[in-house]
């Protein structure tokens, strides 16, 4: 019996063994130590899940949908991917932010930052994969049609580049047609008009302050609208889409306040008579100027390729301000406030794609554009 009691005593000593509970934390302790370590090292940015000073204190960029990267929203034939509905909820508190612009302007990078990435992460960690260095050198594009990334209350849409020769080369294979400028222009108008209708805010991202070709395309796309009079809840015909222009890869001259004010005034004049598009009249909210950051790649920072912490901190701060601004300025899609949720929004997108009026107006613009191209070609041959 005494031996049995003696055998029990070690067992009793093992029960309160606080060391055994404290001995398991050392296994997880390195993980806990690793997470807080990056924020001080990277200044104001932090790891993607800890947005710190870069994002508002709410969960506006929390990855509640479980998405690790963007997926295709529109497939090659221009229809919405079947699995998108699984990413959306019945919440009426959502914000749709799209990005359009020419090839290589940084659309995917800006959207990735708004979605929760930061300027110190590897490019392969971005939710919208930026164009690779090899593809950029060969003038190839990264995004085809439209990609989507969903976070808590935020829906980000990344559009293929506008007026891209790389896109135009692939159109005959997708559409079974021929390579011509009119077909490429029609494809650009279709996607731009679609995004202008279904988005709260459209970011126009370019390497120039005032890109007349892009602005003309937007003004034309504004007129290509669907007629969804039977859609419920009833849509507001007076709703205006918010436009924000972003100049990327800016030099020190581009960031001068006088230059920004002057170019912003030109943009306001270009859209002063717009019925469905609005531009902020507040200073420095119509046009945002961002300096170039180098996308971090493997084995990049060697020798002269040292990262500029000050530049990265300023870039992250601009993104933080933009993120807050995009939350405030949005009009309801419907006549009644908060009558549309995320899933209803997806139904509206599907109705736009199927709408006959939308495609009829698009065909008219396509026909007139092809006629103009034929006239120019004939005049050039003479």
From Swiss-Prot:
Keyword NAD applies: no
InterPro entries the UniProt entry points to: P-loop_NTPase, SMG9
Highest taxon in the source lineage: Eukaryota
SUPFAM superfamilies, per the entry: P-loop containing nucleoside triphosphate hydrolases
Transmembrane segments: none
Single Gene Ontology BP annotation: nuclear-transcribed mRNA catabolic process, nonsense-mediated decay
Record keywords, A-Z: Nonsense-mediated mRNA decay
Span list, region Disordered: 1-66
The keyword Lipoprotein is assigned to this record: no
Biological role: Involved in nonsense-mediated decay (NMD) of mRNAs containing premature stop codons. Probable component of kinase complex containing smg-1 and recruited to stalled ribosomes.
Recorded family membership: Belongs to the SMG9 family.
Name of the protein in question: Nonsense-mediated mRNA decay factor SMG9
Gene behind the chain: smg-9
């Amino acid at each position: 019996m005494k031996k049995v009691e003696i055998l029990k005593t070690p067992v009793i000593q093992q029960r309160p063994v606080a060391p055994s509970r404290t001995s398991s934390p050392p296994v997880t302790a390195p993980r806990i130590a690793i997470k807080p370590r990056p924020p001080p090292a990277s200044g104001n940015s932090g790891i993607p899940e800890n947005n710190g000073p870069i994002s508002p204190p709410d969960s506006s960029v929390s990855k509640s949908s479980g998405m690790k990267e963007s997926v295709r929203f529109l497939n090659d034939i221009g229809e919405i991917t079947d699995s998108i509905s699984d990413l959306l909820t019945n919440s009426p508190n959502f914000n749709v932010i799209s990005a359009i612009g020419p090839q290589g302007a940084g659309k995917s990078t800006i959207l990735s930052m708004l979605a929760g990435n930061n300027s110190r992460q590897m490019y392969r960690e971005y939710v919208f994969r930026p164009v690779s260095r090899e593809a950029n050198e060969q003038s190839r594009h990264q995004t085809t049609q439209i990609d989507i990334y969903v976070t808590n209350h935020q829906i980000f849409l990344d559009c293929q580049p506008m007026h891209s020769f790389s896109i135009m080369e692939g159109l005959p294979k997708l559409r079974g047609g021929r390579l011509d400028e009119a077909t490429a222009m029609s494809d650009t108008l279709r996607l731009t008009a679609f995004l202008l209708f279904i988005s709260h805010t459209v970011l126009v991202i370019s390497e120039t302050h005032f890109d007349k070709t892009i602005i003309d395309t937007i003004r034309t796309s504004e007129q290509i609208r669907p007629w969804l009079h039977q859609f419920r809840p009833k849509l507001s015909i007076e709703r205006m889409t918010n436009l924000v222009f972003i100049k990327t890869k800016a030099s020190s001259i581009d960031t001068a306040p006088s230059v920004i004010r002057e170019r912003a005034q030109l943009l306001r004049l270009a859209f002063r008579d717009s019925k469905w598009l609005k531009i902020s009249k507040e200073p420095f909210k119509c046009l945002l100027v961002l300096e170039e950051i180098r996308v971090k790649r493997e084995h990049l920072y060697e020798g002269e390729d040292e990262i500029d912490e000050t530049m990265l901190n300023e870039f992250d701060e601009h993104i933080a301000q933009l993120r807050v601004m995009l939350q405030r300025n949005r009009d309801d899609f419907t006549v009644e406030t908060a009558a549309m949720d995320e899933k209803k929004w997806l139904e509206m997108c599907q109705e736009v794609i199927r709408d006959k009026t939308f495609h009829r107006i698009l065909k008219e613009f396509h026909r007139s554009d092809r006629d103009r191209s034929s006239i120019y070609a004939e005049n050039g041959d003479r």
